[in-house]
Amino acid sequence: MEQATLGGGCFWCLEAVYQMVEGIESVVSGYAAGQTKNPDYRSVCSGTTGHAETVQITFDSKVISYFEILEIFWISHDPTTLNRQGNDVGTQYRSIILYHSPEQKKQAEQSIQKAGEHFSDPIVTQVEILKEFYPAEDYHQNYFRTNPKQAYCHYVIKPKIDKYLKTGFKVKKEGS
């Protein structure tokens, strides 16, 4: 198993999309790329920790490649808006790829180059080495699955899931 750590707006959105993808074993919402140890949601939202809302994805590279995970990343958020996704504004919502190895860094840079051909504005996604990942509080985990009728889920997360479903990427079978 390998890991990928990505930030692209509210972690609930990326979590919900990647939980559907075949070859993904787990998705954990959390915080990374800041200077505060053991941050919590309130401190991250204050903008004082430097952390971004991120997801840490554990995946089977025999089923899905890191590069494919990045392709899904580009369709799951807008990488051309600095420190914002829709109405979510602040550095905690920045677009960021946190690589786990030199090979992931290389693939991230290649993926940005390729993705840039599909956007009219420049990609502002940061690429940094992952130093530490802090899982978010329990109530943030599996958010869409446990709160599907919540307004944010309906108006923000569901359209991202629908967009993913239209791509043709493999979707997990029921019960897997």
From Swiss-Prot:
Pfam families, sorted: PMSR
Record-level GO BP terms: protein modification process
Oxidoreductase keyword on record: yes
Residues of the active site: 10
Protein family: Belongs to the MsrA Met sulfoxide reductase family.
Keywords annotated in UniProt: Oxidoreductase
Organism: Leptospira borgpetersenii serovar Hardjo-bovis (strain JB197)
Gene3D superfamilies according to UniProt: Peptide methionine sulphoxide reductase MsrA
Protein name in the entry: Peptide methionine sulfoxide reductase MsrA
Recorded catalytic activity of this chain's protein: L-methionyl-[protein] + [thioredoxin]-disulfide + H2O = L-methionyl-(S)-S-oxide-[protein] + [thioredoxin]-dithiol; [thioredoxin]-disulfide + L-methionine + H2O = L-methionine (S)-S-oxide + [thioredoxin]-dithiol
Functional description taken from the UniProt entry: Has an important function as a repair enzyme for proteins that have been inactivated by oxidation. Catalyzes the reversible oxidation-reduction of methionine sulfoxide in proteins to methionine.
